[in-house]
Amino acid sequence: MYAIIPQQIPQGKRAEINEKILFAINSGKDMIPAESIYNCYTGIGGLHNLKQSDFASYHEYAEAKKEFEMGQFFTPHEVCRDMVDVLSPTSSEMILDMCCGMGNFFNHLPNQHNAYGFDIDSKAVAVARYLDPDAHID
């Protein structure tokens, strides 16, 4: 299990940090500790660089934002931990996260071998597979 280390990553640095993390994962070298990846990868949510004032209506802005972000929102680590604590799954129960993103929930499960997840964001899936190699992630 990776420790939750609160991070304050400036909005302007998030895309750069995400790309460095993905480069490290794709290179196959342990260039960045997995715990740092868990705490620093933020996905594409909020990285759209769109301004509402550039659109005729809020609806048009929201649609453009949705198209870029694919509706992505990573549940905060603390919320994932607390939800798993409340559910208290046993190590024999199978868990499915149908929008697993980077696999935040998997970090707190008692048995990674019984964790299943999928996501439409291939970059988030790559991070999830790296962080939780025993989980079944597509």
Where are these predicted regions, by residue range?
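Class I S-adenosyl-L-methionine-dependent methyltransferase catalytic core
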Residues: 1-138
